[in-house]
Amino acid sequence: MTIYYMIVFMLLMVEIVSFVILSLPLPLKVRRAILNAISNSPFAGRVKHVLKITIICILILFADSVRRVVRVTKEYDLAIAAPSTTESARSGYKASQFYAQRNLYLCGSALFLSLVVNRYYLALEAMIAAQDKMQALQTQVEASTNNAKAVEELETLRTKLETRDKEYETLAEKYAAVTKTVEKKKDI
């Protein structure tokens, strides 16, 4: 395998490992810490830039692999049609067809997995942001619920105060009436 296909293979292995790490059922705090470390790291920014360039190179290798598979398949079909083709020539064509298909699948898998990992990472970031927003809204709801309970308690205390004020006024009126009658009796 040539050096550039070794690089593609290494990138494929890194993508598999990163996808497995991102897919692990980690607690929210750990997952948030991992995503924040990846998002905010200046080194990660450089790695993302290099990966974009590498993906473009892999796309070129993929196109070349498709072209090579088509060419090798046509050569093999022509060789099979020729009656003078030896068994060693056929095995040579089969070997070159195998290598061309291997390179095609290797590049295709690396491209596909890079798209999957990228989308999965973005979905995880969106999920973490949504969960943070949900937690903030829950704290607001709890605070408003506590405020609503306080307002409700204040209203019940107000109504109790109003009923006591009314009772006080009625008792004061009764007391005033009783004191008037007692004074009238004293005057007589």
UniProtKB/Swiss-Prot annotation:
PANTHER family: BCR-ASSOCIATED PROTEIN, BAP (PTHR12701), ENDOPLASMIC RETICULUM TRANSMEMBRANE PROTEIN (PTHR12701:SF20)
Record membrane topology: Multi-pass membrane protein
Keyword Phosphoprotein on entry: no
Compartments where located: Membrane
InterPro entries found in the cross-reference section: BAP29/BAP31 (IPR008417), BAP29/BAP31_N (IPR040463)
Matches recorded under Pfam families: Bap31
Keywords: Membrane, Transmembrane, Transmembrane helix
Originating organism: Schizosaccharomyces pombe (strain 972 / ATCC 24843) (Fission yeast)
Major location (coarse): membrane
Transmembrane segments: 6-26, 43-63, 110-130
Cellular component GO terms, alphabetical: cytoplasm; endoplasmic reticulum membrane
Any one Gene Ontology BP term: intracellular protein transport
UniProt keyword Ubl conjugation, yes or no: no
Name assigned to this protein: Uncharacterized protein C9E9.04
